[in-house]
């Protein structure tokens, strides 16, 4: 993708500095009085970041905001697979699991579609490799590259990732949800989501 290149000698994605757009299209729409839905994602781990990106891709006019408690998003993603980011496993079979009824496990494992997430990562520009045990890793074997790629695409889709936010309450009403949280600075804020 734009902003990243694969470097065979270092096996890393490198971010190129590119000037940001001076005008966010979402800001222009809001100024024009166009109401856009708000989507809040609570948690900036691997699933939260992927959900935020998928939401931004599916609803380009939506304002997508991620609230993360930690100072940086993707903390556990960086540790998965011993820092290599084990994305998937193609070698899943009932006999590999301890269960009293392996036959009951078969339909569940058959329902797992490993191709879709890998296709999604590939569309983002992530090359992968599969080891002899069927574990799928980024080609660079660096979890930090997966996080950098997600952060790059989140920025391109104008997704806000707010860190140091501790959610205090989540209330549902007819008009949506209200999330009250404390910022890293200790102030209380409320955001609404549709």
Identify the residue ranges that each predicted region occupies.
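A conserved short coil-to-beta-strand element within the FAD-binding core of flavoproteins
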Residues: 163-176
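N-terminal amphipathic/hydrophobic targeting modules at extreme N-termini
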Residues: 11-13, 20-21, 25-28
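Short beta-strand to alpha-helix junction loop
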Residues: 106-113, 133-152
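Core beta-strand elements of the Rossmann-like FAD/NAD(P) dinucleotide-binding domain
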Residues: 186-194
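Glycine-rich FAD pyrophosphate-binding loop
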Residues: 56-79
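Glycine-rich active-site loop/strand segments that organize a redox cofactor
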Residues: 82-130
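Beta1/beta-strand and adjacent pyrophosphate-binding region of the FAD-binding site
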Residues: 36-47
